[in-house]
C-alpha cells in the first residue's frame, strides 16, 4: 500500500530469450498503473540473478530459453528463498505435460502469449495475491489428465509429494467446474 491508501503496483521480472517479446511485454505492462517491470533477463541463469537483485512480487518466464529454460529455472528456484515468489509461465507451448510439470515445480500460473493485456495484468495481480491462474482454454486437457478415469479406464496417479505447490483436492475440484 502507498501512503495515500492505494495498492502499490505489482513488481514483475520478465524472463524470455526473445528481446522483442520482452520489450513488447514491458511496453504493454507500462500501459497499466497496476504493474511495474523491475527487471528482465534473456535466460534462466541471468533470471536467477535478476530475481535476487530486484526481489519482485511476481516472476514471468518462458519455458524454452538457452542456457537454462523455464522448467530448469523452476527446479533451481525450489531450493531458494525465491521459491516463495509466485511464478507465471508465459509461453507459446500448450502441451499438457509442460503445464503439469511447471505446476509440479512450483509455477502458480500458466498462460499462452496470446492473452490480452487485461488478462495478463489480472493474472499477475492474482498471483501476487496468492492465487493461481491457468488460461481457461488449457484446462480441458488438464482436467482429462487429472481425471479419475482416462479414456483407457485405468486410473491415473500423480505424486503430490513432488512439490509443496501441488494442486490440492479443492483446486482440482474448481478446475473441474
Regions found by a protein language model. Name each.
Residues 21, 61, 66-67:
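The feature encodes the CheY-like receiver
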Residues 7-21, 25-29, 167:
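Conserved acidic segment of CheY-like receiver
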Residues 54-60:
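Active-site beta3 strand of CheY-like receiver
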Amino acid at each position: 500500500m502507498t501512503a495515500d491508501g492505494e495498492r502499490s503496483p505489482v513488481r514483475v521480472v520478465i524472463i524470455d530469450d526473445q528481446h522483442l517479446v520482452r520489450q513488447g511485454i514491458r511496453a504493454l505492462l507500462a500501459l497499466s498503473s497496476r504493474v511495474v517491470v523491475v527487471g528482465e533477463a534473456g535466460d534462466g541463469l541471468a533470471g536467477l540473478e535478476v530475481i535476487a537483485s530486484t526481489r519482485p512480487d511476481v516472476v514471468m518466464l518462458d519455458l524454452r530459453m538457452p542456457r537454462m529454460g523455464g522448467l530448469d529455472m523452476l527446479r533451481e528456484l525450489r531450493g531458494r528463498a525465491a521459491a516463495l515468489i509466485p511464478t507465471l509461465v508465459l509461453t507459446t507451448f500448450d502441451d499438457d505435460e509442460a503445464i503439469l510439470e511447471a505446476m509440479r515445480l512450483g509455477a502458480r500460473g500458466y498462460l499462452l502469449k496470446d492473452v490480452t493485456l487485461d488478462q495478463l495484468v489480472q493474472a499477475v495481480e492474482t498471483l501476487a495475491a496468492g492465487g493461481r491462474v491457468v488460461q481457461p482454454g488449457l484446462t480441458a486437457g488438464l482436467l482429462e489428465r487429472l481425471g479419475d478415469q482416462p479414456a483407457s479406464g485405468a486410473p491415473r496417479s500423480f505424486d503430490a509429494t513432488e512439490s509443496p505447490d501441488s494442486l490440492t483436492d479443492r483446486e482440482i475440484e474448481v478446475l473441474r467446474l
